[in-house]
């Protein structure tokens, strides 16, 4: 009888712990889904930009530029409490864009990469820190303090790069 009672008490005590773990897991899955949606949205914004728009936000791809193919790895957004795309105003991400062109394969394509800030809206606004002396300070001015460590980190989403590589191959095969 004591064993059953102890087991029942243990089960009752574990219910809140299991509930909290389930909530945390669902919350994390929701944030992962939101990051995936933001990656898709920002990739689309970058890939639909004209050469002039790319020039305006710091990319210079040259006269023979073809199509822009990008990979995006979001590491933050504002407001940080957002849980849906509709609530997100700014996305902070690492990006890597490659340009298709005459005879340019993925390995030798012209690329631009690094942290970016993208304001979602109509029209969207893409901000890229300009390269050169003082670059780290310009990144710090662009990216909120809470995301700066990630802004200087490595591209974490290798699947996004592989998907961009495959899109690049499809575009250049035509």
Feature locations, PLM:
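C-terminal partner/receptor-binding element of secreted or periplasmic proteins
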Residues: 131-174
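Ser/Thr/Pro/Gly-rich low-complexity linker/stalk segments immediately outside membranes or between
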Residues: 26-41
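Polar/charged alpha-helical tracts
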Residues: 4-5, 40, 44, 166
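Mature extracytoplasmic domains of secretory-pathway proteins
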Residues: 73-129
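N-terminal secretory signal peptides
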Residues: 39-92
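Hydrophobic membrane-insertion alpha-helices, especially the h-region
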Residues: 2-26
